[in-house]
Amino acid sequence: MSRAWAVSKRELRAYFTTPIGYIVLGLYALVTGLGFTAQFLFYAVMSESPINYDFPAVPNFEETFLSPFLTYCGLIFMFIVPMLTMRLFAEERNLGTIELLFTHPLRDRDIVFGKFGAGFILILAMIALLIVEILLIYRYTQVEAAVLALGLVAVSLMGAAFLSAGLFISVLCRNQTTAAVSTFGVFFLFFIIGYFGGELPEENPAPAGWPADYRALAGVVYTVFRTVATKLPIEAHAKELAEGILQPADLLSYVLFSAFFLFLTFRAIEARRWRA
């Protein structure tokens, strides 16, 4: 792990000897700050006249403010993470230093976990800024510390999931621009799938006039497709976590998503070594 930490320190040094680290932190603080202000003002308006918004009483703070806000903060990583991961491997290839990295006495796991760790440390720094924003109103609310902690864990897991996918895409690209655009494109595709997946009806859309066997098969295929469309998006499992509802399946989905793309990153590096 000491070698992985050495890689992480190298990457962190690169982030903060160039403007990218400061830009990312500043941009995240700005965008989450604007979202925090807008969501809190909207909650205040709803609390003053809940009947106008179909609430019988003052709306629940966790459901109407905390959960949407934390999910929003996690989704911002869809735009931020490509800026972090675009340089992790793509810049190495562009500068010609990736061969030096691979010939250095480092194992693949040292390289992958080191680069992933550097990106995740930056994500944790962004979440620290987020905590400062939440603490401004925490004392005036009745949010339990455990609920808030679980919501922040959800944001962290979203960041890790985005980061692992971006790391894999960076391995495949030759320059930073291609890596950033490709990463955002994949993230946006996940988001669109989830957006339209939530609108899909639950019932079998196959025409009633179809033969029973075909209709049954179409129903199975549609059910699988709808399940994937609603569960695949990275933000799909964060909403309940941000409300303090702990479901092991939600945590496991993020762990498996991140592990899957880290595994693909290992395989991509291994394939590159064989080609070399």
Question: Could you tell me what each predicted segment is?
Answer:
Residues 39-63, 179, 185-276:
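Terminal transmembrane helical anchor/hairpin motif
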Residues 81-85, 133, 164-165, 264-265:
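Hydrophobic/aromatic residues in alpha-helical transmembrane segments
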Residues 19-45, 75-80, 185-189, 260:
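Hydrophobic alpha-helical transmembrane segments of multi-pass membrane transport/permease proteins
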Residues 82-102, 116:
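Transmembrane helix boundary and interhelical loop/hinge segments in multi-pass membrane proteins
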Residues 1-25:
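Aromatic- and glycine-rich beta-strand/loop motifs that create alpha-glucan
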Residues 32-37, 56-70, 113-178, 246:
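Secretory targeting signals
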Residues 65-91, 126:
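Long, hydrophobic alpha-helical segments
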